[in-house]
């Protein structure tokens, strides 16, 4: 589940 670490990260850079 990488969505949990993208909380603050905008799409694109959130890998």
Swiss-Prot record:
It is a peripheral membrane protein. One of its GO terms (molecular function) is NADH dehydrogenase (ubiquinone) activity. It is an enzyme of class 7 (translocase). One of its GO terms (cellular component) is mitochondrial inner membrane. Complex I is composed of about 45 different subunits. Transfer of electrons from NADH to the respiratory chain. The immediate electron acceptor for the enzyme is believed to be ubiquinone. This is NADH-ubiquinone oxidoreductase 12 kDa subunit. The lineage of its organism: Eukaryota, Viridiplantae, Streptophyta, Embryophyta, Tracheophyta.
